[in-house]
Amino acid sequence: MIKIDTSDIDKFVIDLKDTSENIRSDVQKVLKKSGFNIEAKAKLNITNNGSVKTGHLRRGITTDVGNMEVTVHTSNIKYARGVEEGTRSHIIRAKNKKALYWKGAKHPVKSVRHPGSRAKPFLIPAFEKEKEVLIRDLEKVIKW
């Protein structure tokens, strides 16, 4: 009969599982920290680039933390992409009313030609600034 002592291997597997859980926990902490850093930088960018009129877009930048993932996004703000990427010229037509009118207009109109708007990126630059820090912090956690 051949006997093999696996106690060292069993101990190694247990240590490896513990290490794996610790690494997962540390990675989650790094992701969470970077997510909130990106959110803060995006809010600062939106303020600094002159895009804040009501504060609605800035308040809409949020961070969601999940299991081994973090998402920084603009929740339910339809014009956020237009601010980030800019817009082409387009025609705005009255939807519910028969005409468009705004303070200072000479008379109501059925449509107006919007010249478009230049991009005022806020989210992508925030990520780009944080990316190197995130990679460095993840490398520290994963090396053992």
Residue ranges of each PLM-predicted region?
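Short, Lys/Arg-rich flexible segments
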Residues: 1-80, 93-144
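Short, His- and charge-rich active-site/binding loops that engage polyanionic ligands
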Residues: 90
